[in-house]
Curated annotation (Swiss-Prot):
Transmembrane segments: none annotated. It comes from Levilactobacillus brevis (strain ATCC 367 / BCRC 12310 / CIP 105137 / JCM 1170 / LMG 11437 / NCIMB 947 / NCTC 947) (Lactobacillus brevis). Residues 1-54 form the ClpX-type ZB domain. Gene3D superfamilies: 1.10.8.60, ClpX chaperone, C4-type zinc finger domain, P-loop containing nucleotide triphosphate hydrolases. It comes from the Bacteria. GO terms for molecular function: ATP binding; ATP hydrolysis activity; ATP-dependent protein folding chaperone; protein dimerization activity; unfolded protein binding; zinc ion binding. Keywords: ATP-binding, Chaperone, Metal-binding, Nucleotide-binding, Zinc. The gene is clpX. This is ATP-dependent Clp protease ATP-binding subunit ClpX. The keyword ATP-binding applies. GO terms for biological process: cell division; proteolysis involved in protein catabolic process. SMART domains: AAA (SM00382), ClpB_D2-small (SM01086), zf-C4_ClpX (SM00994). ATP binds at residues 120-127.
């Protein structure tokens, strides 16, 4: 900083008009002067604007109890999993907000905790992750691990997962960097059993290795148009440090691994009461999966290490599926009731009909995921005929409508009036 002494007359600040005598210092530039008071004022304005921006970037995170309360409106059952996920998500976004403040804190650095969700097909893994993103109002993307291969082989690069998130954030990189990515079928990239084959495992262990960096946190180069990367292509850089990764899979056969670990071969002498209790309770084996079981299943240690939070979903029973059909905020039965109401027709499902649909889903081993196709099959002919009729006031779905494709019971308008 320097004072101008070469100009004729008193030097004044170009911004406030004060002279040298009225301020401590005046800084000169090409044809312009600024005093120390205006410099301080400019700094205050910039700091205030920066703090406002930081505040805007801070996510409003509901408490774990509030997250579970909202999840209960959409997801039936899975109480333990919902509690685990709500705490994990709450802590993750507390960490994100703390990092956004950029405070000079000498305390411990909070590390990211990604989540692994184990559960049978149709138990709600994807829907839970999707619901969490909706509650937090952050971008969300779903990826299928079976489509991924390591770089240089036919298939998708792992960076394409980030592209989906970026697209769902409308190419807003800052929003994408705070999103949630759910990678499904993660059990399908377990490394193959040791054998004499010299073929490289490009869709198993190779993909696990390729995912390590983005799970942990790295600056990834994402091709904006997708596809394979090539040297002439421009990239969008995404920092994955604050992206929450949730991976899920059915892990068929892992119950056997848990059972062996808990002492399946020591029935009677040597088996403690806790082991016997677990072994006698079927589905509860899933609740006792530990990282060592995932290692034996075929996930590599480095990959497991980046998924410190592990939770399991129980297989849905008949009662759960009936509740899923009727209770959630956007339950399928409520959706079809609304569809028919738009044609001024009431829709009623007899309780026994709902149970038959639940039994069908269990028989097909599709869980909650298969309920939509079942109810769509039941309703298809009804929804085809009804718009052409003006005499129907109410449709009643019976068990026979579900099991035998029998005609539903119709209540006509003149019958209802009488």
């Amino acid at each position: 900083m320097f004072e101008n002494t070469e100009t004729e007359g008193p030097v004044t600040c170009s911004f406030c008009g004060k002279t040298q005598d009225q301020v401590q210092k005046i800084v000169a530039g090409p044809g312009v002067y600024i005093c120390n008071e205006c410099i301080d004022l400019c700094k205050e304005i910039i700091d205030e604007e920066f703090n406002q921006t930081a505040a805007q970037e801070t996510l409003e995170v509901p408490t774990p109890a509030d997250i579970v309360k909202t999840l209960n409106q959409y997801v039936i059952g899975q109480t333990e999993a919902k509690r685990t996920l709500s705490v994990a998500v709450y802590n993750h976004y507390k960490r994100v907000n703390e990092m956004a403040q950029e405070t000079d804190d000498d305390g411990p650095e909070l590390q990211k905790s990604n989540i692994a969700v184990i559960g049978p097909t149709g138990s709600g893994k994807t829907y839970l992750a999707q619901s969490l993103a909706k509650i937090l109002n952050v971008p969300f993307a779903i990826a299928d691990a079976t489509t991924l291969t390591e770089a240089g082989y036919v298939g998708e690069d792992v960076e394409n997962i980030l592209l989906k998130l970026l697209q769902n954030a409308d190419y807003d990189v800052d929003r994408a960097e705070k999103g949630i990515i759910y990678i499904d079928e993660i059990d399908k990239i377990a490394k193959k059993a040791e054998n004499v084959s010299i073929t490289r495992d490009v869709s198993g262990e190779g993909v696990q290795q390729a995912l390590l960096k983005i799970l942990e946190g790295t600056i990834a180069n994402v091709p904006p148009q997708g596809g394979r990367k090539h040297p002439q292509q421009e990239f969008i850089q995404i920092d994955t440090t604050n992206i929450l990764f949730i991976v899920g899979g059915a892990f068929d056969g892992i119950e056997g691994i848990v059972k062996r670990r808990l002492g399946d071969q020591t029935i009677g002498f040597g088996a403690d009461s806790q082991e016997q209790h677990v072994l006698s309770s079927g589905d509860s084996l899933m609740q006792h999966v530990i990282p060592e079981d995932l290692l034996e299943f075929g996930l590599i240690p480095e990959f497991i290490g980046r998924l410190p939070i592990l939770t399991a979903l129980e297989k849905l029973d008949e009662n759960d599926l009936v509740r899923i059909l009727t209770e959630p905020k956007n339950a399928l039965v409520k959706q079809y009731e609304k569809l028919l109401a738009l044609d001024n027709v009431d829709l009623q499902f007899q309780p026994a009909a709902l149970r038959e649909m639940a039994k069908l889903a269990i028989a097909r081993n599709t869980g909650a995921r298969g309920l939509r196709s079942i109810i769509e099959d039941v309703m298809r002919d009804i929804m085809f005929d009804l718009p052409s009729r003006t005499d129907v006031a109410k449709v009643v779905i019976t068990p026979e409508t579900v099991t035998e494709h029998a005609e539903p019971e119709l209540v006509l308008k003149d019958q209802k009036a009488s």
